[in-house]
Curated annotation (Swiss-Prot):
Origin species: Schizosaccharomyces pombe (strain 972 / ATCC 24843)
Name by which UniProt lists this protein: Protein atp12, mitochondrial
Cross-referenced InterPro entries: ATP12_ATP_synth-F1-assembly, ATP12_ATP_synth-F1-assembly_N, ATP12_ortho_dom_sf
Keyword entries, A-Z: Chaperone, Mitochondrion, Transit peptide
Pfam family, one: ATP12
Example GO biological process: mitochondrial proton-transporting ATP synthase complex assembly
Top-level taxonomy: Eukaryota, Fungi, Dikarya, Ascomycota, Taphrinomycotina
Function: Essential for the assembly of the mitochondrial F1-F0 complex.
Protein family membership: Belongs to the ATP12 family.
Transit peptide: 1-10
Annotated compartments: Mitochondrion
Listed Gene3D superfamilies: ATP12 ATPase (1.10.3580.10), ATP12-like (3.30.2180.10)
Domain of life (superkingdom): Eukaryota
Molecular function in Gene Ontology: unfolded protein binding
Coiled-coil zones: none
């Protein structure tokens, strides 16, 4: 019987702590500080169906998460397993970095969340709700800035997202008017409770996808749109970087730095969108079987 492979426990001169490499909260790609990396030490990748679940194998050994859990997905999400296998199959032979594994690390996070106790899930919800109080989509520029043109773009692009979010979740969101200056901003307790109830309805896969997008784009609202399939990753990144893009169009940019940052954001948001769509497919298949 083949022994499961726990990468971050391997004693190899070429392999740093896999837990560090896999850390979701990574340094941005544009950072001058080098990211942790490790060398490729396998030749073949494959998937294996076992007991209604799909496992990912490298040279016949099961892939494990940093916490030691076997990385596996339900049979109804088999596409996700193939995407993970593809990530590992396409890795270069040297200097593998964590941003090369966006889907793998996201699935690993979902597996960890599935083991959370009630208190841990509540803490995660509290952390996510804080992003709604400082949501990018709810903070508007002063009318005097850029002759009010940036504010016009924000209202045109962001306001529909705010209204959709409010209608779907039955809440009324307050927003920060730039003309009011820098002041504390927080949603009502009633809104927080409704949002908490919605978060409690999400499964571990949905929470992992949502957590990643929230942390990347700093917007609870945009992340909700990605999870529900209302926005693709390209559009979500553009909406998140609306102010930066406006300034870039006006003043120019540090080309390489901005491009790398934007690609890194789109890459992470795309992994959240992919997982969200796989979850939808799984639910659709379950409904088909039920009928």
């Amino acid at each position: 019987m083949l022994r499961s492979l726990q990468f971050y426990r391997l004693s190899s001169k070429n392999l740093l702590s896999f837990k560090t490499c896999y850390s979701f909260y990574s340094t941005k790609a544009s950072s001058p500080l080098p990211q942790p990396s490790f060398r490729r030490f396998w030749k073949n990748t494959a998937t294996k169906i076992q007991n209604g679940e799909v496992l990912i194998q490298l040279d016949g050994r099961n892939l494990k998460s940093p916490s030691g859990k076997i990385v596996k997905v339900p049979k109804e999400m088999e596409l996700l397993a193939h995407l993970i296998a593809l990530e590992w199959d396409r890795l270069p032979s040297t200097s593998v970095r964590q941003h090369n594994l966006p889907i793998t690390s996201l699935v690993s996070r979902a597996i960890d969340i599935s083991q959370f106790k009630k208190e841990e899930k509540e803490l995660l919800s509290t952390q996510l709700i804080r992003f709604l109080d400082t949501d990018t989509i709810l903070i508007y520029s002063p009318e005097t800035e850029y002759e009010g043109k940036l504010l016009e773009e924000q209202k045109e692009n962001w306001w529909p997202l705010k209204e959709t979010f409010e209608n779907k979740l039955g809440v009324q969101l307050s927003y920060l008017d730039g003309d009011a200056g820098i002041i504390a901003h927080k949603q009502t307790q009633e809104t927080h409770e409704r949002i908490r109830n919605w978060l409690s309805s999400l499964n571990s896969w949905q929470l992992a996808a949502f957590e990643r997008s929230v942390s990347c784009c700093k917007s609870f609202i945009v992340s909700f749109m990605i999870l529900k399939g209302y926005l693709n990753s390209e559009k979500a990144a553009a909406l998140t970087n609306l102010e930066l893009q406006y300034q870039t169009n006006r003043w120019g940019s540090l080309e390489d730095a901005h491009e790398i940052d934007n690609e890194d954001l789109k890459n992470k948001l795309a992994s959240s969108a992919i997982l969200s769509r796989c979850i939808e497919d799984m639910h659709d298949k379950s409904n088909e079987h039920a009928h």
